[in-house]
Amino acid sequence: MKKVCIIGASGFTGGELLRLLLSHSGVEVVCATSRKFKGEFVYRVHPNLRGFTQLKFVEPTIDAALKADVVFLALPHGESVKWVPKLYESGVAVFDLSADFRLKDPNAYVEWYKWPQPHPYPDLLQKAVYGQPELHRDELVGAKLVAVPGCMATASILMLAPLAKYGQLGEVPPVVDAKIGSSGAGAEGSIVDLHSYRTYVVRPYEPVHHRHIAEIEQELSRLAGRRVRVAFTPHAVDIVRGIFTTGHVYLDKLPAEADMWKYYRSMYGDSKFIRIVKDRLGISRYPNVKYVLGSNVVDVGFELDPRLNRVVTFAAIDNLVRGASGQAVQAFNVAMGFPEDEGLRQIPVAPI
C-alpha cells in the first residue's frame, strides 16, 4: 500500500486525482493540501466525493508531503520547481502535473514559459521521465521523478506518434488544430472563462507559439530521429471537458491505408487505453470527445486524402483524466509496479 499526498488538491486536476486514487486498491491518500481551504472537508470543494472520503485539506508543507511515499504535485506552472528538489532528495517519488520538468532543454523555459532565466535544475530535468506510458514505458519503471504531459500535447503527440516513428511526417511541418473545453482553464479562470463569455464560443487563443508546442516537438523529434517542427493552434469551445485534435500531414507520397493500420496497430495494438477508431459503420466512425469523457481512454484515427497527398489524423481525450490526472495515475502504476489500469477502469460516460 502506497501512501500518497496531493499538493494542490482543490483544483480540477487535484479533484480528479482524488476521485481516481480513492478507488485505487494500492493507495492510501494521507493528505490533500490547499492553502485556501485548509481545515475544510475535501467534499465541500469537490461535492462529487461526498460519502467517499472524510479527508480534510491541510496546509501545503514539505513536512506534510514527507508523510507519504508518493507525492502528486497539482500546482500552477512555476510552483512545482520550488518543491521537487527537496522531495526528490528525500527519496519521495514525485509525479508533477505542471510543465516544470517536461522539457529537456533548460533554455526552453525562457522561450516557452517566459522564465527570467534557464531552468535552475538541469540535472533534474535529465532525470525526469516524460510520463506518457505508451511512449516511455521502460523509463517509467521505478522512476522517482515523472513529468506528466500537458493535455493538448498528449492528444497531439499520440495521434502523430505512429507517423513520426515510421518516417511519415514529411518535410512540411504538420498542422495541428486543437479544441478544448472550459475546464482546461482551471478552477480559477479569467473573465473570458465565465459562463456569459464561454457559452456558444469557438475562439482561437495563443494561435502561434503556444507553450505545448515545445512538448509536441520534443517528443515527435525523439520518435522521428530528427528535428520536427509543428504548426499548432488551439481553440476554446463550448464544452466543459474534452480535447479534440486534428492533424494535417502533407507527404510527397501517401502511404497505403493498410500501412497506416500497421503503423497505428504496431504502437497501440496492445494498449489498455488507446483505441483506433476508423469505422465504416456505426454512429461514431472517427474519434469523438463525447465517447471518452470521464475515462483515461484515448481515441485516435486517421483518413487519407490522395488529392493532396495528405494524412488527416484525429485524437479525442478527456483533458482532466487522460490529459492530466488519469495519465498521472497511469504513469504511477507503471512506475510502482501496479496493473496499468488500476484505478482507471472507468468506462466513458455516454450520453452526456
UniProtKB/Swiss-Prot annotation:
Pathway recorded for this protein: Amino-acid biosynthesis; L-lysine biosynthesis via AAA pathway; L-lysine from L-alpha-aminoadipate (Thermus route): step 3/5; Amino-acid biosynthesis; L-arginine biosynthesis
Stored SMART domains: Semialdhyde_dh
Keyword Protein transport: no
CDD domains: AGPR_1_C_LysY (cd23939), AGPR_1_N (cd17895)
Keyword Cytoplasm part of the UniProt annotation: yes
Keywords, ordered alphabetically: Amino-acid biosynthesis, Arginine biosynthesis, Cytoplasm, Lysine biosynthesis, NADP, Oxidoreductase
Protein's recorded name: Putative [LysW]-L-2-aminoadipate/[LysW]-L-glutamate phosphate reductase
Lineage: Archaea, Thermoproteota, Thermoprotei, Thermoproteales, Thermoproteaceae
Name of encoding gene: lysY
